[in-house]
Amino acid sequence: MSNWLSDSIMAKKGEANGKENSSHSITEDSQGKYHYVLGAYAEPVLTVDPGALISVETHDAFEGKIEKETDKPSEILNVPYLNPQNGPIFINGARKGDTLAVYIKSMKPRGEQPVGTTCLISEFGGLVGTKDTAMLNDPLPEIVKKVVVDEKGVHWSKNLILPYQPFIGTIGTSPEIEAITSLQPDYYGGNMDVPDVAVGNVIYLPVNKDGAYLYLGDCHAAQGDGELCGVAIEHPTVTEIQVDLIRNWKIENPRVESEKFFMSIGSGRPMEDAVRRAYRDLIFWMEKDWGYDKLEAYFLLTQCGKVRLGNMVDPKYSMGASIDKETLLKGLNN
């Protein structure tokens, strides 16, 4: 366990106290069929107890179908069959009203190089007309860029290597009754594309259904805020996660804890509503768990709160509102 993790909410409130008690793996072969919706109607591929360490072989967002730079996404991809998800993982003892804690222990690229893919897709992206934001402009040309991704970095060009900063673009629990496309984010998690859902951090997800039914996939090697053209550096990975279960800690939005900050994630359209949802949840969190007066938290976040833009291209946009741990704790002493 990392030094900070032993002092995390996961370690303090989790059934397994943030400690590993078993090891499991989901390989591409054992996964078999990948999923394109998050719901409780698929047979769990794995059943574990809180404290389980799980190694997962994720696919890229295109399930490996874009193989070369001459490929045309419009001819190869079948929307909405994008964003393949591993899982579901059934967590023993998880009940509605609990919270699932997922510590992201490690992520590594896998497969034959070049494993990284980004592209321009017709009528998709933050600065183009889409089916939802219809324009008269002609679509941009379809362009595919394949890049080598290793632990040294993302080899963008001969002279430029971007840092390898992997994170899980899509992770979530099953909604209570719906089965929702893996392309959409919401209260259960989903396709948030928030870069802070990264190695070394914990994401907290609401349990809406017995067993939680955890899904994950769509791992990114690098991404700027907003995922502007709609496609980050998509790559297949071996991702190692550790799960724990927090009883009777009911949350309504995904939350992230790092060594330095606490974050609430809100999803919605327009973008300002996603920000409102994130900040409101953070204020309620500060009030309930740390004893802040609600209006004092509102005042404080006005001065020092930070906002992280996850994606601005999905059916709903995702925003993360955060406060530094040091600031939050010092504010309690006034």
Annotate the PLM regions.
Residues 106-199:
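Intrinsically disordered, low-complexity linker/loop segments enriched in Gly/Pro
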Residues 61-72, 107-119, 211-221, 310-312:
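Short, Lys/Arg- and Gly-enriched loop/turn segments at beta-strand edges
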Residues 18-77:
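N-terminal, Lys/Arg-enriched amphipathic/low-complexity engagement segments
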Residues 164-272, 277:
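Conserved mixed alpha/beta catalytic, RNA-binding, or beta-rich assembly cores of soluble enzyme
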Residues 29-39, 79-86, 180-188, 282:
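Short, structured beta-strand/loop micro-motifs enriched in basic residues and often containing a Trp
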Residues 48, 91-94, 197:
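Short, well-ordered loop/turn sites that connect or cap secondary structure elements
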